[in-house]
Amino acid sequence: MARVCQVTGKGPMVGNNVSHANNKTKRRFLPNLHYRRFWLETENRWVRLRISNAALRLIDKVGIEQVVADLRARGEL
């Protein structure tokens, strides 16, 4: 699926643009996605993920090995 974080599952949200005159038109709030490469020491290879900024912080916190293990358990990698 496009514009979805591979780690957290964050996707686009729907909301409104609100003008000064309080007119409302529909808009999409897109997640802050980036393609990033991570080196897996255990497999001696790079893995390329499309992740949000929140997922990048999660990887900094728990480590890429744990995140990849969770992705494999869900069957997404």
From Swiss-Prot:
- Gene Ontology annotations for the cellular component aspect, listed alphabetically: cytosolic large ribosomal subunit
GO process terms (BP): translation
Q: Which Pfam families match?
A: Ribosomal_L28
Give the top-rank taxon of the lineage listed in the UniProt record for this protein: Bacteria
MF annotations from Gene Ontology: structural constituent of ribosome
What family does this chain come from, according to its entry?
Belongs to the bacterial ribosomal protein bL28 family.
Protein's UniProt name:
Large ribosomal subunit protein bL28
**Which species expresses this protein natively?**
Leptothrix cholodnii (strain ATCC 51168 / LMG 8142 / SP-6)
What gene is this protein translated from? Answer: rpmB
